[in-house]
């Protein structure tokens, strides 16, 4: 979680966070269903959902995860009145316009709501969530175990401490 007294600063030191198992990371790594991590202290109407996908995914697992993320985000948006769906993906500078077009098609959103950002996936998600004032970010996680999980973590885990929005993590088990 985040220390509410210091906006934008993680509660856990990043190096310590990578090496120690914290309850939220353990839940994410062992989940067999989507996990909702609530950051907001009060329930508020859902006005903006952000689907975080990898438009450049080149393997079946990540493409399937993209499909599941978009399906969850679309369902949540359709269940709320006056809610808008945005989509974000990190991309290379040379492909930005083409990837933004692909992202809009993939997510089924107007081009103005498809954000292909030249950044790391974590930074693209966090920056876009702040820019569009997302109430909820839907993100995917490919479950990892062992030393690789301990050292690298994944984008959902890295974004967890710095996002202000609630986070719905859709897990794809390998």
Question: What is the predicted role of each segment?
Answer:
Residues 1-45, 129-174:
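Gly/Ser-rich helix-loop-strand patches that form or flank binding pockets
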Residues 11-12, 118-121:
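Short beta->alpha connector loops
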Residues 15-16, 61, 65, 117, ...:
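Residues that cap or flank secondary-structure elements
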Residues 20, 66-69, 121-122, 152:
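Amphipathic coiled-coil/heptad-repeat helices and related helical stalk/stem segments
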Residues 23, 96, 120-126, 155:
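Short acidic active-site motifs
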Residues 25, 71-74, 101, 126, ...:
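Active-site phosphate/pyrophosphate- and oxyanion-stabilizing loops and adjacent acidic/basic residues
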Residues 44-115, 168:
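Small/aliphatic-rich secondary-structure junction motif
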Residues 50-51, 127-131:
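Short, surface-exposed amphipathic charged segments that create phosphate/polyanion-binding patches used
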């Amino acid at each position: 979680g985040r220390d509410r007294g210091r906006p934008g600063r993680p509660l856990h030191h990043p190096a310590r966070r990578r090496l120690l198992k914290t309850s939220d990371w353990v839940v994410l790594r062992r989940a067999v269903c989507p996990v909702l991590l609530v950051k907001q202290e009060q329930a508020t109407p859902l006005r903006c959902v952000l689907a975080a996908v990898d438009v450049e995914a080149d393997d079946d697992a990540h493409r399937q995860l993209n499909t599941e993320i978009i399906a969850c985000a679309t369902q949540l948006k359709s269940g709320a009145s006056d809610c808008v769906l945005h989509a974000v993906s990190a991309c290379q500078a040379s492909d930005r316009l083409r990837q933004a077009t692909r992202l809009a098609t993939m997510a089924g959103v107007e081009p103005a709501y498809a954000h292909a950002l030249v950044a790391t996936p974590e930074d693209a998600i966090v920056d876009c969530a702040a820019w569009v004032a997302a109430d909820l970010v839907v993100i995917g996680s490919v479950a990892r175990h062992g030393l690789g999980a301990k050292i690298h973590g994944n984008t959902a885990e890295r974004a967890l401490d710095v996002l202000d929005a609630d986070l719905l993590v859709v897990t794809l088990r390998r």
